[in-house]
Each structure stands twice: as structure tokens, then as C-alpha cells.
Design a protein with these regions (language model features):
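Conserved class I S-adenosyl-L-methionine
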Residues: 35, 41-82, 187
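Class I SAM-dependent methyltransferase SAM/SAH-binding core
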Residues: 88-138
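Short "lid" loop at the C-terminus of a central beta-strand within the Rossmann-like core
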Residues: 184-189, 227-228
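Conserved beta-strand signature within the Rossmann-like core of class I S-adenosyl-L-methionine
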Residues: 176-183
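Acceptor-substrate binding/catalytic loop of class I
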Residues: 192-208
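Core SAM-dependent methyltransferase catalytic element
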Residues: 225-246
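A conserved beta-strand element that flanks and buttresses the S-adenosyl-L-methionine
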Residues: 149-150
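A short glycine-rich, Lys/Arg-flanked "PGG" loop and its adjoining helix->strand segment in the class I
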Residues: 163-175
Length: 246
């Protein structure tokens, strides 16, 4: 699963809508901010799975055509993996560019996405890797991975669903393994519009992410909030230092 790089949860209800322009033209053409009341926010969060399946081919084409401005955090994640590591990509979308880059470095990838169309693209592009149609909020495998990432996917979940993901992260990450996810720079919700369809985003406060990581056995390695060098993404990179409960 992917998301429009230009829209972050810093754009909350009550903020004046953007005119759709952006200093990064490849981002601006993907999505424009669009604003709703609280009830619509809840509906928007519940429609994410259907949204990505409906627009899977268009979104995949747009993502592949856009410049990969958020590559540095992915590269940093990769440098922390042991040789031959197995990586779980939650919300993998069509596999380009993130899963394809990780696979090209010689790592084993298990990609999970709720969109059958997106997973079909992954299977065509990288048939030697493992691809699963599932919702990250409920998927379980009984396996632990050396690396787990939820990039441009986690922040499509509502606040409570985001909180519930941390025990899942812990259960999926091997001791000493690395976790990477991105969200927004502050607590909030926003709904953008992709091809005329509402597209929901949410974020908790950075301090709450830090607490959730700590409480679920992770040690924070790095975080960045909206830095241009990281494609203006806000991300958290952490290592599992305590084995999750069996």
C-alpha cells in the first residue's frame, strides 16, 4: 500500500485547503488536501482498503513515475539488516520502489497488502519473493523477521488501530531486528483526495510513538520529522531489544 507523499497528517480539520501546488511537482500531482468533519474522518479510515484496490493500477503507475525522494530512510533501514535478512513489508503496494530495492540487495521479502491487484503486481515483478493478500491489522504468521517496515501505509490507519499495531510489530520482529514506519509530525487526521476519492491519513504525537515503542520492547535508533533530506517524511527507526511475549 502506498500513499500520496505530499499529504501528511499535519493538515488537520480546520486548516485552509491547499491550492494543490507544491515545490516538488511530482508530489503535487498525486494528491490534494481535502477536508471533512469528524464523522467523515471515521468513514474515511474505514474505506482505505477499498480505495487502494479501486485505484491500484493508477496509483502504481503514478508512484513509479514519481521521483523517489524518500529513499534515505529506506537505505538507513537496509544498512542495519544482517546479511541474508528476511524482511516483512506491511502495506507493500505494488512493490516499487521499496520492496524492489530491498530485494535487489539480496534480502528475502515477505510483502503484505490488502489489495489483490497490488499483490498480483508484486508476484509478477518479484516471483521469487513471498506475497500475501491480507490486512496488516489482523495478519499473523507465527514468524519473526529481521526487519519490519510499514512505509507509506501505517499512517492510513486510525489512531486506535495505530496503537494496536505495536504489539503486532513486536510479535513480528526478531530480537535485535529493526522496525521502520512513517507517520505525521503531530497528532491529527487529514483526508486528501486521489482521483476524486477521499484518502485518509492519521498520526499520533511523536512522544506517544516513542512510548509505544518502548512499551513494546523497542529501542529508538532515530527519528526525523519532516526533513527535506528524507523526502519530508516523519519516520521512526527502532530495534527490538526485548523478546515479545509468546
Amino acid at each position: 500500500m502506498m500513499c500520496p507523499p505530499s499529504l501528511h497528517p499535519r493538515e488537520t480539520v480546520g486548516t485552509a485547503p491547499s491550492d494543490g501546488t507544491d515545490k516538488h511537482a511530482d508530489r503535487a500531482r498525486l494528491c490534494r488536501p481535502y477536508f471533512y468533519d469528524g464523522a467523515s474522518m471515521s468513514r474515511g479510515a474505514s474505506r482505505i482498503v477499498a480505495h487502494y484496490e479501486r485505484h491500484a493500477l493508477a496509483w502504481d503507475a503514478d508512484r513509479r513515475a514519481a521521483a523517489w525522494t524518500d529513499k534515505p530512510p529506506i537505505e538507513r533501514f537496509v544498512t542495519l539488516l544482517r546479511p541474508g535478512a528476511n524482511v516483512l513489508d506491511l502495506g507493500c503496494g505494488g512493490g516499487v520502489p521499496v520492496a524492489a530495492h530491498i530485494s535487489a540487495q539480496g534480502f528475502s521479502v515477505t510483502g503484505v497488502d490488502s489489495s489483490p491487484t497490488m499483490i498480483a503486481l508484486c508476484r509478477t515483478r518479484m516471483p521469487d519473493q513471498e506475497w500475501v493478500v491480507a490486512d496488516m491489522r489482523s495478519w499473523t504468521s507465527g514468524r519473526r523477521f529481521d526487519g519490519v517496515l510499514a512505509w507509506d501505509s501505517f499512517f492510513h490507519l486510525g489512531h486506535d488501530d495505530q496503537r494496536r499495531m505495536f504489539p503486532i510489530f513486536a510479535a513480528c520482529t526478531a530480537s535485535g531486528g529493526v522496525l521502520l514506519f512513517n507517520a505525521g509530525p503531530a497528532h491529527g487526521e487529514a483526508i486528501g483526495s486521489y482521483r476524486g476519492d477521499p484518502l485518509y491519513h492519521a498520526s499520533l504525537d511523536p512522544s506517544e510513538y516513542a512510548a509505544l515503542l518502548r512499551d513494546n520492547g523497542f529501542e529508538l535508533i532515530a527519528q526525523s520529522v519532516g526533513e527535506p533530506a528524507n523526502g519530508e517524511r516523519s519516520f521512526w527507526l527502532a530495534r527490538a531489544v526485548r523478546a515479545p511475549p509468546v
